[in-house]
Amino acid sequence: MDMAWQMMQLLLLALVTAAGSAQPRSARARTDLLNVCMNAKHHKTQPSPEDELYGQCSPWKKNACCTASTSQELHKDTSRLYNFNWDHCGKMEPTCKRHFIQDSCLYECSPNLGPWIRQVNQSWRKERILNVPLCKEDCERWWEDCRTSYTCKSNWHKGWNWTSGINECPAGALCSTFESYFPTPAALCEGLWSHSFKVSNYSRGSGRCIQMWFDSAQGNPNEEVAKFYAAAMNAGAPSRGIIDS
């Protein structure tokens, strides 16, 4: 009787172990937090050198999740990548637009966002970033350089009119200054893409926040940041569940 009971326990343990290991391909292992690419529309499956990365994306050329062609498209006013038009409320100021290009380069090219990658139920991507700790100076400069440009929405992630094939302001949405829609730097950096970023209290060079801008000749400072947060997660942080947006 005891032998039969022990055999039953072993069988149940084997079944539970098998079920736990049979995860879908899109699932990201808890330890898979460093040097990884998102499972998204234009990302490579693995980071690798890209010597021909264009313009503002060039800091990632030593190790990138984006291709050279993707980096070129990111610099266009309306690229074929997402058919997204920065100039939906008139011409965006160049000093403002450079921040959006840099934001796009970070999103598409960085292999150091693993600790903040989450699974999503979306047709065009299986993963997104959530609450990436953006260095406070990068956010403040972004807001300062864009406060006099114009937009019609405080969340650019959803709610656009796509009937023409590119994003247009939804009915009733008025074009006004960024400062009207984003009264603070945090309102811009955190609200713009549904909390992809969270403004950090840490400064650039601290090793505790992600830098949108960096000099690649001095190395990529975001590698150290990713390692710090990955170690914290592996030490016992919350689970990485599936979210809807």
Swiss-Prot record:
The gene is FOLR3. Residues 1-22 form the signal peptide. Spleen, thymus, bone marrow, ovarian carcinoma, and uterine carcinoma. Its main location: secreted. It holds the Pfam family Folate_rec. Belongs to the folate receptor family. This is Folate receptor gamma. The keyword Disulfide bond applies. Glycans are attached at N121, N161, N201. GO terms for cellular component: external side of plasma membrane; extracellular region; extrinsic component of membrane; membrane; specific granule lumen; tertiary granule lumen.
